[in-house]
Each structure stands twice: as structure tokens, then as C-alpha cells.
Amino acid sequence: MTQLEAARKGKITEEMAYVAEKEGVSPEFVREGVAAGRIVIPRNPNHKTLTDFKGIGEGLSVKVNANLGTSYDYVDVEEEVEKARVAIQYGADTVMDLSTGGDLKAIRKRILEVATVPLGTVPIYEAEFRAARRKNFFDMSADELFQVIEEHGKEGVDYITVHVGVTLKNLEVYRNSPRTTGIVSRGGGLMAAWMLHRGEENPLYARFDDLLDIARTYDMTLSLGDGLRPGSLADSTDRAQIAELLTIGELVERARRAGVQAMVEGPGHIPLNEVAANVQIQKKLTGHAPFYILGMLPVDTAAGFDHIAGAIGGALAGWWGADMLCYLTPAEHLGLPTPEHVKQGVIAFKIAAHAADVARGNKRALERNRRMSEARYRLDWEGQFALALFPEEARRLKEERGSKTKACSMCGPFCPMNLVEAVLKGKGRMELPVA
């Protein structure tokens, strides 16, 4: 029985109760959200190391995903395992293995071993990889793709990205809508190239019921990928993007009827003035399915610092209702990220998600910020470290340049909170040291 099927029968599962406790909401709130398809809990029972269940969706905190995985040029399995550990250490709520080089099955197995949070994959990468190794990737058969999906389910993958909206009809819309950067989704591009070369429909769309059968068997959440997402501001919110979203909205309903959890992936390169519209359109067209976005990236020119630019767009999108942010790293658009890049990406996007939680009125986020302000006013450093999103970094910076006073070394004896409080408490004129 899937989480969705259990919820519809009125059952509160172990995972629902856990999510409710973590989120500070009632188990019934979570159950109702899962039953309605507004919340998903990616949870494949075959993922034995998964202990930190996550709820993604409306009424819950904004989540962050961290992508990792090998590439054609760089294959270092232990580095990818280290990336997974680093991502989880700094607060990633889920991780995705996007490996395209090396022994993909062995890499996935190693990452599953250390992933205490849900793990996602993009099965078409492996299906195309096998076909390319045999002859060329156009040689991939539909059966081969579904075989890979089944294998991922058996191994314990919790959610899979499937580019079901890249259909022949939507590719016609794309071809008649000139773009600056074309198709930038790797999985979507692979599927589109396969379809155009062979003149065949997307098997994930044509055989969607087969996909649902596999997903239901392993309770794999479907992350309906946006293969036609914009890859530049010039292409944002265009006809191809919206045409694909309309198709995805229809498939969300079919997944729900089949008892399969589904969330929807979104852009991408979107200017700030279009962020709200993109979130609202997605929610409207998909029956408020959880929205999992890449960024959003509000500028195309932040190469080397896309994690900062993406966090800006992600915070705004989260405020408007996006439910999970896929992080960007400093290496985005430039190369395969290192563990340090992963760390910086997770940090930036956890801050963005927290900012969105505050704006959405999340009670725990608001309370944490209130307590931090009180500790800061008291110059209670241990209290501040405990409440900081990243305590170790806060402590390191405080101790790196300490002060002779109780305050920090920026203001020292001139700390305004200290000075004014002293006067208000009747301590009178304070003697300040002369530098």
C-alpha cells in the first residue's frame, strides 16, 4: 500500500506521524495533505537506510534538494559519496544521484548506503547510457527504459524524475516557438532527441500506466520533470513551457487516481517579475501538486555565483508557494561540482528556504528568529550559536576575531544594544575606552 492509498483509507502511517512531529503540525493535517495530493512523502520501503522521512508540499516547511553524481569526464565514486554526506550534514532534505559516468548501479548503491534522506534519480540517464555503450543512445528501447525504472525501484530509490510532458505534440509547440537556448534539460533533451530521431512518441507518456504500475509497486514518488523548461530569461514562461505544464497537470490527476504520489518539477531561468505567475500557474494547473523548482535563477550572468543568484529566486518562489528548491552550486553552468561547492550550494538554499518559511508564516521559523533576536540583544553567544542555521560557522567567525568586551569585535564597547540598555537600567554615563 502506498502512502497515498493509506492516507485515503484514513490511515496515519509511521512516515506521516514522523513528518508531523518534525513539522510541528498534526498527523491528521499530513494525512489529509497526502490524501489530496498536496503533500508527498517519498518513501520506498526498499531504501533501508532512510530514517529521516520528508514531507514536501503545502503547509510544510520549504525543502532543499542537492544534486550529485558522476559525469563523462569525472568518475570518482567516493567523492560522490562524500558529496552526499556533506549535503546531508548541511541540511539537504533530499539528494539526487544524476550520475552519467562509470558503473551507475554501483554508484547508486554506495549513495543509497549513506543516504538517510530520500534519494531521487533520473532513470533515462542509465537507459541511454546502456544503449550508447552497446551501439548508440538512439538504440534504447522503451522496454529497456522501463526495465531500468523497475531496477531503481527494487534498489530503493524513493523518487524518480520522468520527463512525461515531452510529447510529440509539445515538441511541435517547441519547434514553432523560437528559443535562445533551446532545450536545456539533460533528461528532456535525451528524450526529445530520441523521439525526433525515431519519430516515436515518448514511451513515458505513451505507456504512462506501465510507469504507474512500477511506481505503485515500490511507492516511488513520481517527479514529473520539465524537459521543456526555459534555459534563459529570454525563453521564460513561453508557449513550450506552458504546453508541457498542461500535459503534466493531466498526468498528475492520473497518478493520483492510481494511488501514486506525484510532484511537479519547474524552472529554471525566470526573472523575478515572473516568479509569482509561474508558481500560481503551476499550482492551478496541477491541482496544487507539490512544486519542485530548479532555482529559480533570476539572472543569466552570475556564473561562478549561481548559488547566490538562485537562492534569491528560490526565496521568492518559496514565498509564493514552491515546496522544494533544487540547489545550484558555484559550478552551475561551468562544470561538475566538488564537495565544497555542494556545501556552499546547500547553505545558500537552506537560507533561501528558511527565508521563504518566515514569509509564509511558518510558526517554527518565526519562533526561531524571535529567539535569535532575543539572544542577540542579550549578547548571549551560546544561545545565538544554538539558534543559527549553521552553528559551527557562526562560532568560528565569532572566535576568529574576538573582542575584549562581551560584544563582538565589530562594535566592541560601542555596541548600541549594550550602551542603550545600560542607560535605560540607570547605570548613567559609561566610560568608553579610547583606541
Curated annotation (Swiss-Prot):
Binds 1 [4Fe-4S] cluster per subunit. The cluster is coordinated with 3 cysteines and an exchangeable S-adenosyl-L-methionine. Substrate binds at N67, M96, Y125, H163, S185, R186, G187, D226, G227, L228, R229, E265, Y292. [4Fe-4S] cluster binds at C408, C411, C415. Zn(2+) binds at H269, H333. Its EC number is 4.1.99.17. Pathway: Cofactor biosynthesis; thiamine diphosphate biosynthesis. It comes from the Bacteria. Its cofactor is [4Fe-4S] cluster. Disulfide bonds: none annotated. It catalyses: 5-amino-1-(5-phospho-beta-D-ribosyl)imidazole + S-adenosyl-L-methionine = 4-amino-2-methyl-5-(phosphooxymethyl)pyrimidine + CO + 5'-deoxyadenosine + formate + L-methionine + 3 H(+). Coiled coil: none annotated. One of its GO terms (biological process) is thiamine biosynthetic process. Belongs to the ThiC family. NCBIfam families: PRK13352.1, thiC. Catalyzes the synthesis of the hydroxymethylpyrimidine phosphate (HMP-P) moiety of thiamine from aminoimidazole ribotide (AIR) in a radical S-adenosyl-L-methionine (SAM)-dependent reaction. This is Phosphomethylpyrimidine synthase.
